[in-house]
């Protein structure tokens, strides 16, 4: 289910920009400035829709559904004809990332003999999992139901994203593999997880203005951390303030303001490797607007 802003009157000569992102504390934190009108842009009005990331991935593939949308990097080649990546607003794991967890100790070689619950086949977590071992058997489960499904014995293991990376141990689960650690050891790079894409048809001027607005919103949240975190707490599933702050720090930081040359290289490396391994059927054409 998606949550949308209540409709408001749009003044004449105002461009309405639809923004969609996930209902996660890190996304809420970075969009705090725009969502609460702390950041305003003359001539532009921003509307916000909150959807789970797999829904956003699929909507952006079917059509240019939103002007700006959060996506998993894995999904980008499928929507690159209509969207380009923004140079800010992304989340990367620098030596950490999605995890395979289980209710019992498992060796890595055991994974090929079981079914693994995954949060969606368009997530970057799934792409990284398949690069790690393309033979693994998976089944899609809503991301917030993966831990309960493991606890109930429906799956021997699951691939967790979002806040589950911090709460799995309190649910009695054991970490089998951190894909962010594996990726760093394998490539020497950070693991790019999600970013924001903007509709190509908006044009260069709007691209520049909207990119700056998002960058200003991120900077505002970083500069007013306590207020932004208070706002984000309403989206922090099962996290207390301490854990929510830790989670936000993991995924909203200087890299969110700008990936940097090495961050952009990591995005290209991830997608190129997915294409070379036959996981992604479309050759990635990665470009950015700033």
Range-by-range predicted roles:
Residues 14-36, 97-157, 161-163, 265-269:
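Bilobed "Venus flytrap"/periplasmic-binding protein-like clamshell domains
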Residues 85-108, 184-201:
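Hydrophobic/proline-rich hinge and linker segments of small-molecule sensing/allosteric domains
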Residues 17-18, 82-91, 115:
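A structural signal for short loop-to-beta-strand junctions that line the ligand-binding cleft
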Residues 203-273:
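Secondary-structure end/capping motifs
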Residues 144-233:
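Pocket-lining segment of extracytoplasmic ligand-binding domains
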Residues 39-50, 132-145, 280-286:
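A local structural motif
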